[in-house]
Amino acid sequence: MEKEKVKLDEVLKFLFSTSNKVLVKLLNGIFNENFSVDEVELTVSNNEFVEDDLGILRGDMFFDILNKDYNKASYHIEFQTKNDNTMIVRMFEYGFKKGKEQLKSFKNYTEDIRTIYFPKQKVIFFEENKNIKNQLKLKIIFPDEKEIIYTVDVMKYWEYSDEQVREKKMYPLIPLQLFKLRKELEKAHNKKDLNRIKELSNNAKELAGKLAKQSAILFEADEILGEDFHKMLLAIQNLIEYLNRNYMNDENIENEVTTMTKTLYDPEVEKRGIEKGREEGIEEGINLTKKVFKLASQGETIGNISKICKISEEKVKEILD
């Protein structure tokens, strides 16, 4: 696997562990939804599927959104640094595997027809490439010559400025603006163009400062929690470290960016974030109890309630008692 893909995966996995408040807004921005943070419950769902040869098919991110009526919508996001002609086939595999996995929880089907629901899917490409279209398409032809065209929408991240990312409230993607410098840095590095590398190094430092300050403003405006703010600053540091050690070799930039982010990060932020998390935990407990009782009143078994709510059967019994 390419080193930039590995680093991007690491950073994105970290950023996608931000609070549910932030992740709901992120999904709204990516999929043009309009979920209210206070009216839905978001969970990160399984992203690993066992294949027939016992190998593991692993996707990037899967989410489930449950509204106040307990209707569920599923979402799937894949991240790509470069164009890949096999991506659409993998998206079909991921979607089918997730649909098959969720089939077990559906009870409303006729004896002779089963229904598999694909999640809403999107591929986010981070580096510019003129060959990347707005949609990925796969034609599937059955033996009777019936055809279907399976499509997945694409988000071209390089087309978004930091202001546009912020306006769409895709806050965890803000630090990834730094990754947009990678391609130019690689060109300058390969050409051994020291002047261009120095210029891009200065650009990276300035951009890191700008993104960190934007994150601080979001925290002050209560758009993100303290834990989210902390993770965004750490992602900025991590990306600067990656760019520097692979392309820039600037002996000062890592320390300068780390110092800058520390001056923005109030030690009380973490404490406030934990306190708010406890308050949210109480509210989540109340909502869980309501959900368990409603499912029980609808005739769901303890086993099914356990699977739907993602809690143990013992916990279900404890709530119902």
List PLM regions with ranges.
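Conserved single-residue anchors adjacent to enzymatic active/cofactor-binding motifs
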Residues: 1-250
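Intrinsic-disorder/low-complexity detector
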Residues: 248-321
